[in-house]
Amino acid sequence: SALASVSSAPLNEVMAFMLRHSDNTLAQLFGRLTALKRQAGNSIKTDTQAVADTLAEQGIDTSGLQMADCSGLTPGSKVSVTTLIEMQERNLTAGIATAAAEGLSIPGLVGTARNRIVTGPDNGLFRVKTGSLDAVTSLAGNVSRVKGGVLS
């Protein structure tokens, strides 16, 4: 008989939580899980390479992508606007990847963007991922169009 058991939310729900609340520890762990799944090793370097390889295999332009870690906290990481847009577009259209798009923070409502864009007719139409370091603040995501469709 079992001495103990552990259960958790499905990974897509954990990823949605990570994105919505900018949980850097979970971000790093998702990089590690990617590397381990790909049998790439067990280090920050193999984590970042596994993530970059996975993005490229999905047809996402990774030109100029530099990842110092998977959390985004270590100085030296760079990502292009093209890479961010292609990731958002894929997340909106690629089956299970839609959980990543749906898990983004909603300005005025939930997550790290809950105190941004809190009033007005556009409230609730944006889903965004916030980011900030000492000298940088960023925002990437998508917006629902009034007449249908989504823009990244």
Language-model features: where?
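A small/polar active-site loop signature that marks catalytic segments
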Residues: 1-98
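C-terminal soluble interaction/assembly domains
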Residues: 50, 62-152
